[in-house]
């Protein structure tokens, strides 16, 4: 969607939230939470418009903050302009350097090469293998095998900063000069938890929320957290957040009814499918001996529709 207007993905990926509540039983407030004011029981969330909303139970699912093209503006009216600006950058560039060889950087490179095979794309990654050490070497090697035919890989190296305006190349930390007229940051996400910074003993040093196995924060039993922001040793993915949500909902109901919280989170196995354009990709399922897939199967699972129909249904929108 950010690379080109092919397939008009914005028509499917930008999902309205007017049907988010089942049977319409809920109120949607479109605003940003700037802080949380805690009282002995419950408290208030403070909005950027100055309004305060009281809560008896608070669930925080604010997700991640990103850099680069996926750092979307907060105001809906600015998103379309942002998308157009990013597309122009990719269209005009001839030599693209992606800083980061995780799933975002890999999928971005595949999309670029699908649309513009003639463009030069280089991924610079700080580790000796693509992705990270959560995944076994056999999967990381398979990823390199899949992407190397179309994309240059510079491993165990880093891009020290942004491209100087008018520059035609960038020099890596190890002194390698790479021709570039566009550098795209793709080095991962950070938890979007600034709104909780005023509360004591809620955040870990890494900015994630310290939780119990019931998803309650360690400091406050009436504040729950889930998704990318929790301090749990697992890869941050939308699929995991969906699994968290069902458990949190059950525990919140138990909490307000004064019942024991029975849903206890013990983590999950790692699963990832990474597209390499529309017709290729790689995947890993962390069950049994660790299953690695590639090619047509990875494409079938994700590349054709990016799982957007399922996401739309889950948020109350039509396919």
Curated annotation (Swiss-Prot):
NADP(+) binds at residues 129, 188, 265. InterPro entries: FAD/NAD-bd_sf, FAD/NAD-binding_dom. The keyword Flavoprotein applies. It is an enzyme of class 1 (oxidoreductase). GO terms for cellular component: cytoplasm. The record marks 125 as: 4-hydroxy-2-nonenal adduction. It is a single-pass membrane protein. Induction: Expression is positively regulated by the cross-pathway control WD-repeat protein 2 (CPC2) during fruiting body development. Its EC number is 1.6.5.-. Belongs to the FAD-dependent oxidoreductase family. Probable FAD-dependent oxidoreductase that plays a role in the regulation of fruiting body development. This is FAD-dependent oxidoreductase FVFD30. It comes from Flammulina velutipes.
